[in-house]
Amino acid sequence: MGKRKKSTRKPTKRLVQKLDTKFNCLFCNHEKSVSCTLDKKNSIGTLSCKICGQSFQTRINSLSQPVDVYSDWFDAVEEVNSGRGSDTDDGDEGSDSDYESDSEQDAKTQNDGEIDSDEEEVDSDEERIGQVKRGRGALVDSDDE
């Protein structure tokens, strides 16, 4: 006798996990308080926090999702916090960075109204060369003797 034929299994539908559209605020730390809207017509993604009122806008493309706008916001906040976002170096004056040298400050205090010893030597060399060219001190005796 023959075996009973097994029925074929139907393929299972894949569950597509939707990405979040509500996020945690980076400033006030409230959960799911940041909502994201995508304006694909104008290519602008906007985030805004309902609690603290913080907002952010960035350019998007046709494939962008709300999580992309949130990640851009996260990167921008990190960039500002690390100091790379500012154009001025005002915050660097009081810090003790490994890359700063104290010799720059020493040079500034020395050059305030004082002449550097190297500059004095250059001035005396220029005067000596100028005297030779003007004929005050002849290097070679003339042939007229």
From Swiss-Prot:
Segments forming a coiled coil: none
InterPro entries in the record: Elf1, T_Elf1_sf
Annotated residues for binding of Zn(2+): C25, C28, C49, C52
Domain of life assignment: Eukaryota
GO BP field: transcription elongation by RNA polymerase II; transcription initiation-coupled chromatin remodeling
Segments for region (Disordered): 80-145
Biased composition annotated in UniProt, kind: Acidic residues: 88-104, 113-126
One GO term describing the cellular component: transcription elongation factor complex
GO molecular function: RNA polymerase II complex binding; zinc ion binding
Keywords in alphabetical order: Metal-binding, Nucleus, Phosphoprotein, Transcription, Transcription regulation, Zinc, Zinc-finger
Keyword Transmembrane helix attached: no
Function: Transcription elongation factor implicated in the maintenance of proper chromatin structure in actively transcribed regions.
Protein name: Transcription elongation factor 1
